[in-house]
Amino acid sequence: MADEVIAKEQAEKEFEDWCEACGIDCDVANMDDESASDFTEKKKRIIKACMSGLLVFDNGNIVYTISNKSPENFAGVQLKIGQPSGKLFTAMDGLKDTQLFKKQCCVMSAMTGKDNGFFEKLHAIDFKLLQTIAVFFLTI
C-alpha cells in the first residue's frame, strides 16, 4: 500500500485492542463460517482505513477523518466515535424493519453526533466504513 501510514501488524493490534475495549468478540473460531467471513471482510475495511491514517484508535474510541472522495465541505471532517451505548439501539426505535438504510444512519448519528442527512452526502467509501463500525457495535 503506497500511502501506508502505519504497518498492517500495528493496525491489526490496535483493532483487536479496540474490539476488546468495546466488548466485541473478534475470535473467528467462535463464529460460524458465514459470520467469520463477514467479520473478516469488515475487519479488513477498518484495518485498511487505519493503515492509511484516516482512522485512528484513541483510548477505546475512534477518530475517523472523512476522505477527500467525499464532497469538499465534508472531506477532512473528523468524526469522533465513542464507546457503544444504549443510544445506538434507542436511535432505531419506531423505525420499520424494512427501513434498513435509515436505521443504519440513525446508528451512525448516535455514534458521531451528526444528523442523519450528513451520512447521505458522503462518498460510498466513507459511508461503508462508518456503516461497518455501526454493524460491529450492533453485534455486541
Task: Put a short name on every predicted segment.
Residues 1-140:
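Short, surface-exposed, charged amphipathic helix/loop patches that serve as local interaction elements
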